[in-house]
Amino acid sequence: MIINKLLSHLNNLSLSQLPDFINKMIDPDTFKRKEFIYKCSQESPEGSYILDAGAGQCPYKGFFNKQKYIATDLSVGDINWDYSKLDVLSNLETLPFKNNVFHSIICINVLEHVKEPFNVISEFYRVLKPGGSLYVTVPQGWWLHQEPYDYFRYTNYGISYLLEKAHFFINDIKPTSGYFSYLANRITFLPKALFWTIKSKIIRILLLPFEIISYLLFVLLIPIILNCIDGYDKQNKFTLHYMVKASK
């Protein structure tokens, strides 16, 4: 019984279950994106309308308690998600809003999941107020996810091209990581690749000590070391994501 519970816990292990200070050392990429969203909340006036485009489970709603937060999504990305917090169910290519409504739009790791990203970005431009800001994050180095709704990966040149084509002015574009943090992120999946596909419970139990060691090494120790030296990569061509602020 204890072994079964331990195996179940390992199969469902998530970095979010770890304390924040450890999680930040293992996964600084996620924390940088949260800081990016916090920046949007600080730069958006109290009472202004904020659109979370592709909001999913609305994990960023709490950042905008002083603004009028509106969440929209097509709710097809993940069958296990809870979409009940959405305000509007819509296709991002045809947003059901009037022109020039929102002061800010956040679109966090969404544009890889739409078939026509230019059409979506053009819609953002339409519903954004003149002088308003768009805060976008897109993946460059990320695994296949939310299948079959996973279509694109973006370089800084690719996302810049789409935004400028839609008449946005790019204020800032930054990578979230360099080569070492990219490598750290990849390594955390090694225990899953090695052990989670084993169907025989007996073999899994026999290998359990090695699995636990693999978590300590490849999910904790090595990623922390790699993230600590990520600053040595000055080019950041292996980044996990780009964060872009653009204005109308």
Model-assigned labels for residue ranges:
Residues 2-6, 14-17, 50, 91, ...:
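Acidic/proline-rich low-complexity IDRs
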